[in-house]
Amino acid sequence: MEDKSNTIKRISTLINSDTDFKILKDIHNISGGFSGEVEINYLGANLSFQIIIPEQYPLTHPNSDNISITFKNEDYIGLGHINPDGSVCFHPDKDDDFNRKFLYELKCLKQWIKEYYILEKEDDNYTYLIHKTEKGKFDRLYFTNMKNEFKQGEFGQFDYSVFSNEKFGDDKIPVNKYFRLGFDNEKQDKWSESFAKDLNKNNCKKGLYYYLEEEPLRKSIKGRKSIENWNELGDYLSNDFLEFLYKGLKSNFGNNFFFDKSLFLIVGYKIPNEHSYEEHWDLIKINKGEKLIEAKKLSKAERKSQNNYFTYCLSNQEIKWGSTENIDYSRFFGRGKLHSKITDSNILIVGCGALGSSLAEILVRGGVKNLVIEDFDSIKGGNLCRANYDLNDMIYPKTIGLIKRLKSISPFLNVKQLNVKMNHFDLEKLKVFIDKNVDVIFDCSTDPEMTFILDEMDVSADVFSMAITNNAKSFINITGKDLTKKAKLFFD
C-alpha cells in the first residue's frame, strides 16, 4: 500500500489538476482515511465541501453502499441528491485505477452542481424532507395510508402504541419504535386485527395531529429545506390550534399524552404517488414543561377584526424532529408480494415442521393476510437445524413459536392456531367449516392419515400435499383428488 504522505500528495495533485477546484484546507490524515476542504467554481456557482477519502481508495468506504469519495456540506441539505448528513449522493462506477477514478468522481460532483444546484432538477421519485433529528436518540413512528380525507388546518388527537423501548450499542443509545393506531375521528391505521390487538396490549399513548396540506418548507431558501424552528412553523399553523396547544401544555394534557416526558405532534401534508397523492406525516417531540408559545392580549380593535382575545406566538426554539415511515401494505410488500390470488386467500397449513414452518414464513413474507397453522407437537433441539424456530422456542408447542415468528415479520397478518391433530374433530363439521372459511390447504404433515382425512372430506379448497423424502432426496407435491392413492406411487 502507498505511503500516506505520498497518498496525500497524489490527492492534492489530482484536485489541483482541475482548474475549477481549489484546496481551501490541506488534505490531511484522519482516522480511516484523508480529509480536507475544497472550493469549486463551476458554471458561475461557487460551492465548498469537506472532502473525505477512505484509506482503501479506490475501494469504497467500509460498511457503505458503494460510496468512495464523500463531498459534504450541511448547508446544501434540501437540494436534490443530498443525503441527511449533507453529503452529495452519487454512486460512481467501480474502478481499481486510483487516478482515473478520482478524476471521474470530480466530474460527477460537477454534474451534480449542474443538474441539482443550478438547474434544480426534480427526479421522478418523490424525495422526502430531511429533518434535523435529536442527537443521541432515535424515535420512529410507523403508519399506514388513509383515504385522503383530511382538510387543511384540521387538528385533533391520535393514538399510538409504544412497540419497543431499547438501548443500542456500547453507548446505549435509546431506540424507540411506535406504531400509530388511528385518529379521534375514527380513522384507523390498517394493521391486521391480530397485530392491532397486540399493539393495544402495549403502553398506549395519545398525541396531537395537525394537517398542513403543504410541505413545511423554509421560505426563500434554495431547494426544499425543512423548517427547523418553531417560529417558522407558526406560519403554517392556525391561531385556533396554537390556542389549543397553549392551553393543553399549561394544564389540559395529562400523563396519557406524554411518553418519556415528551408530547408527540404529527404534521401531515400531501406528497405525490403513482396514482395521485397520499398523506405523509412527520413527527415532532415537545418536551414536558417546554415553553413554546406566548399568549398576547389583543387590543379592542384587533379583537373585533380577529374575533379573538389573544394571539399566540411561537418561540424561535429548535424543533425536535423524530422520524417516521409509511409502511402501508402496498409499500411493505412493494418488491416481494406474491400474486393476489394467494395473498387474499384464507390458508390452512397442516404440520409446522421443517416444511410447514418454512412455507408459512415464505407466504407471510410474500404478503399473505390470513393464515391458520396446525400442529400437535412441541419443539425439540433437533428441530432447530431444519425448521424456523430458535432456542427460546424449545419445549413450547410448534404453533406458539411459529406464530410469534410470523407476527414479528408482518403487521398485516391475521393468524390463528390449532394445537391438536385434525382427527380430533368431527369430520363432517370440519368439512363444513373448511368449505366456508378456507381457500387453500397445504398439508405439510407427511402423515398418511392426513391424506385419508382430506380424501374423506373432499373439501372445496385447493389442496396441496407436500413432503420431502428420506435423506432429502426429493420434494413431492401432490394435488387434486385421491391424495392417498397418488402418494403411494411415490412412497410405497
Describe these PLM feature segments.
Residues E134, M146-D344:
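Glycine/serine-rich phosphate-binding loop and adjoining beta1-alpha1 elements at the start
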Residues K22-H91, N99-L103:
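Compact alpha/beta protein-protein interaction domains typified by the UBC
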Residues I403-V438, S445-P448:
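A structured beta-alpha segment of the ubiquitous adenosine-cofactor-binding alpha/beta core
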Residues F376-F412:
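Glycine-rich phosphate-binding loop and adjoining beta1-alpha1-beta2 segment
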Residues H81-G136:
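Domain-level detector for trafficking modules
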Residues N346, D439-V440, D462:
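Structural motif
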